[in-house]
Amino acid sequence: MSMVWMLFPIYCLFTNMSRVWFLADTHFGLKNDKDMWLDDFTNYFNDVVIPLMRKEYRDGDILVHLGDVFDNRSVIGIRTICETIDIFEKFSEIFKDIRIIVGNHDIYNKSSNDVTSIKMLERIPNVTVYKKPSVEVIDGKTILFNPWVNELESEKKLLESVNADYIFGHLDVSGCQLNKSGSKSMSENSIDSKNFKNSIVYAGHIHKRQDYKNVHYVGTPYQMTRNEMGDINGITVLDVASGETTFFENKYSPRFKKVSIYEILNKTVGELKEDWKNYFVDLHIKGSDYIVCKFDTLTEELMNYFKEFNIHSENNDDIIDTSSTENGVEKKSAEEYVDDWLNDNDIDENRMKVIKELYSKYKEKI
């Protein structure tokens, strides 16, 4: 695989910038373009982020998206395309300078960044898309804009050739925490933080907001899977000259929440509605207790106020089937539960394909 261009980043000169507003891993079109998720994402931007940007914008501020604008690498729904373009057009009305760094979910071929879904955003005024590395001097600081690179050795050579104050990129840094389970990024394409030398790094790719040595993952704007339960999400703004950051926490979007039977029993229905509205609520309970407590009526009531209400067995963590036409809970097929599990555990596409093939194979034998 030849990626010689990685050794020769483009150098440009820019000045008079105030701050950088970071976005990363927006994943528009999540879960096969499901309307509920797209509505949640676009509502957050239209109701919270864009008004915030209009209020807090300072002359010279730029907007940098650190990759994975979209979720699906090959198929994007028409509504997702229209909504995403609409949001970036609104960004363009605020910012005179918008940079989008290509992420691994934004490219069709894993070995090349040339075919990218971000191409549809290039014609929006003030938007620059980075498919190749670019070094720019802003307010006296040297900044490397580094898109996704699928070849570790090429990336190491690139970093060795550049002495940057800041690196903005879509990066897989070894040792960073992937999610609340504590598992670390250790893939064969992970790059060691020492390769960044003394550069301060702001990155997308890993969804959990965190600081690791000189690397700062800005995290997703909102929660997308149960693995992100408990994460603090929002928007990070960097003052390049001083190095200081401001964080605007997202207190608007739905969150995942795990609760016990005791938390349910100690609250009134009114308190449950108020405290957990707009949540994906997972109730963990023993199967025998579920039968005794007769949750059907409560489930029917709460489904009108929660984004989702699932009951899990404490013994094996399986979802207890509460589906029926009477209680208003959406009935899911076994295939849908498998898809939900794969999405919640952020399985890569190759492994996902193998798991689905194995499921189909053994399902026929049951």
Question: Model-predicted segments: where are they?
Answer:
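Core catalytic region of metal-dependent phosphoesterases/phosphodiesterases
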Residues: S18-R19, T26, L30-V135, K194-N198
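Divalent metal-coordination and catalytic microenvironments
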Residues: D25, D68, T84, G103, ...
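Active-site environment of divalent metal-dependent phosphoester hydrolases
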Residues: G29-K31, D71-S74, I101-S111, E151-E153, ...
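Accessory, non-catalytic peripheral segments of nucleic-acid enzymes
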Residues: R58, V240-I366
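Conserved catalytic scaffold of divalent metal-dependent phosphoesterases
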Residues: T84, D106-D192, V218-P221
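Conserved beta-sheet core of the metallophosphoesterase superfamily
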Residues: N179-T245
